[in-house]
């Protein structure tokens, strides 16, 4: 597997078949794991097409497996970045870390996607 992220909060690896494995560690790891699982399920129920799909969630290992949403974006216009996160709010989720490091580009359909929902919140009225 290719390791793409290794921080105090999480390790992320991409398998050869393209699935993304994220393991949570550090402060509040169980809480962040639970939150990301809840947010991804919320977005899938609303058919949000520009976020990863949750394939597995293992609370005993604090690990999720998701679909791959492409490669990290190096440059994105500030206005387009705002539009992307505003579009996400239309599905009832505020990301709370609206940074380019949480945006990928999926070449298969030319779509910018949003990843990393461990700090996100579900907006009032969407719960």
What are these regions (language model features)?
Residues 1-42:
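ATP-binding glycine-rich loop module of kinase domains
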Residues 70, 100, 119-121:
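Short, glycine/acidic-enriched loop or turn micro-motifs at the edges of active sites
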Residues 36, 97, 116:
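Acidic active-site catalytic centers that drive phospho-/nucleotidyl reactions
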Residues 25, 29-33, 37, 41-84:
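Conserved structural core of kinase catalytic domains
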Residues 90-94, 106-127:
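C-lobe/activation-segment region of protein kinase-like
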Residues 15, 58-60, 106-108:
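Structural motif
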Residues 98-105:
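Hydrophobic residue at the +6 position relative to the catalytic HRD Asp in the kinase catalytic loop
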